[in-house]
């Protein structure tokens, strides 16, 4: 998981230069920043690397490091037993994700973003600032900039046929990133509302259930050695 940096964000927001040593199973945060997954090599980066600034997010007053998401697969990280993750690593997430396919749940949402209102049924949503999520590189596109004051938004519509489900998979994993079932855009602020509380995950941890979520970007908030 990649939760350690986000847990301390509120305390270090006084502006300090951070070092990060990855110790999780997937390590999206380290992968995005180009930090070695080897702990000794990562420690060396802290001493002889360079300082980089990157954006963080705020969801209903809670700081997060690189991703806030709801829907399909998002409970995998914190529901997968730690001993299983220790043994299988990234494969543990894959196995748990496959279980979710048998219980696809949709959410009817009203989304306010970039002076536009959208309404529809979605099975997955992700607001992120990362080149890797769940161990999948470039899932948010190839033009991700970590310090541009914008986060990438990915919304997956509810499929009503096997063909649409196939289009979703292709849209998320293919390099052209285009699918009628997957909406993508950038923003510095988004509000998502629903009639019922929706479970969220934040940096791989339980983010609680919310009927209304407001997410905004804190531009170049953190300095880190890379």
Please name every model-derived segment:
Residues 2-9, 13:
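Single conserved hydrophobic/aromatic residue that forms the stacking wall/gate
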Residues 105-107, 121-123, 147-152, 186-188:
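A generic structural signal for short beta-strands and their flanking turns/coil linkers
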């Amino acid at each position: 998981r990649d939760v350690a940096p986000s847990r301390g964000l509120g305390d270090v927001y006084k502006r300090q230069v951070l070092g990060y040593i990855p110790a999780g199973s997937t390590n999206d945060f380290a992968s995005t920043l180009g930090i070695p997954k080897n702990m000794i090599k990562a420690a060396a980066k802290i001493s002889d690397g360079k300082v980089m600034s990157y954006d963080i997010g705020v969801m209903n007053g809670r700081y997060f490091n690189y991703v806030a998401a709801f829907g399909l697969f998002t409970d995998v990280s914190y529901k997968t037993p730690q001993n299983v993750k220790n043994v299988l690593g990234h494969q543990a997430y894959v196995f748990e994700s496959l279980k979710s396919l048998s219980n696809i749940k949709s959410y009817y949402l009203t989304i306010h973003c970039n002076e536009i209102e959208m309404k529809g049924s979605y099975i997955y949503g992700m607001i992120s600032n990362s080149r890797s999520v769940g161990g999948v590189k470039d899932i948010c596109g190839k033009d991700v900039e970590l310090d541009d004051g914008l986060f990438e938004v990915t919304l997956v519509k509810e499929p009503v046929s096997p063909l649409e489900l196939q289009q979703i998979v292709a849209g998320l994993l293919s390099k052209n990133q285009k699918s009628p079932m997957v909406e993508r855009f950038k923003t510095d602020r988004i509000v998502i509302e629903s009639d019922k509380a929706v479970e969220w995950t934040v940096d791989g941890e339980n983010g609680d259930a919310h009927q209304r979520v407001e997410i905004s970007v804190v531009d170049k908030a953190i300095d880190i050695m890379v």
